[in-house]
C-alpha cells in the first residue's frame, strides 16, 4: 500500500474539496487515462486495488502510471470510546481527488485493451470516472 515515508506532522485537518482540479488534469505519460468526475478521498487500498486490476488485465503488454498519491492521514477513534480526550490516531492514508484529476494512465496497448482494463479499475473507485484518450 502507498503511504509517505515521513511527514512533517502526524495529523491533519479534514479540509474541504472545493472546485475543480487545475493540477494533474492532463495526460502526461501514456495515451489513455482514467479521469475523476467527482470529488472524493481515495484510500491507498482503493488505489492499489485499481492498479492491480489494470496490471492483471494488461499482463506484459503496456505500462501503467499511477498519478495520485495518498498523502493525507485519516484518524479514527476506537469503537465505544467517550467523547473528548483528543483526536484519534492515524488509521489509513487517502489521496484528495477533485473533479478533472487523472487517476491512472496507460500506454503501449491498443485502445480496446486499455478501455477494458481501465473500466475494471474504474469499478474499484468510489466515484464516477471517465476514460479519456490523448490527442
Swiss-Prot record:
GO cellular component: chloroplast; mitochondrial large ribosomal subunit
GO MF term set: rRNA binding; structural constituent of ribosome
UniProt family annotation: Belongs to the universal ribosomal protein uL16 family.
Localisation: Plastid, Chloroplast
SUPFAM superfamilies: Ribosomal protein L16p/L10e
Domain of life the protein comes from: Eukaryota
GO biological process: mitochondrial translation
Name of the protein: Large ribosomal subunit protein uL16c
Primary location recorded for the protein, binned into one broad class: plastid
Gene name of the encoded protein: rpl16
UniProt keyword Ribosomal protein present: yes
UniProt xrefs under InterPro entries: Ribosomal_uL16, Ribosomal_uL16_bact-type, Ribosomal_uL16_CS, Ribosomal_uL16_dom, Ribosomal_uL16_sf
Amino acid at each position: 500500500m502507498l503511504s509517505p515515508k515521513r511527514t512533517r506532522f502526524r495529523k491533519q485537518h479534514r479540509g474541504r474539496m472545493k472546485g475543480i482540479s487545475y493540477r494533474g488534469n492532463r495526460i502526461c505519460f501514456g495515451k489513455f487515462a482514467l479521469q475523476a468526475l467527482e470529488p472524493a478521498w481515495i484510500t491507498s487500498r482503493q488505489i492499489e486495488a485499481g492498479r492491480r486490476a489494470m496490471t492483471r488485465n494488461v499482463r506484459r503488454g503496456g505500462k501503467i502510471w499511477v498519478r495520485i498519491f495518498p498523502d493525507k492521514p485519516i484518524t479514527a477513534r476506537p469503537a465505544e470510546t467517550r467523547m473528548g480526550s483528543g483526536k484519534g490516531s492515524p488509521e489509513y492514508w487517502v489521496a484528495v481527488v477533485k473533479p478533472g484529476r487523472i487517476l491512472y494512465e496507460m500506454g503501449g496497448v491498443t485502445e480496446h485493451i486499455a478501455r477494458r482494463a481501465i473500466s475494471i479499475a474504474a469499478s474499484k473507485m468510489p466515484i464516477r470516472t471517465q476514460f479519456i484518450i490523448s490527442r
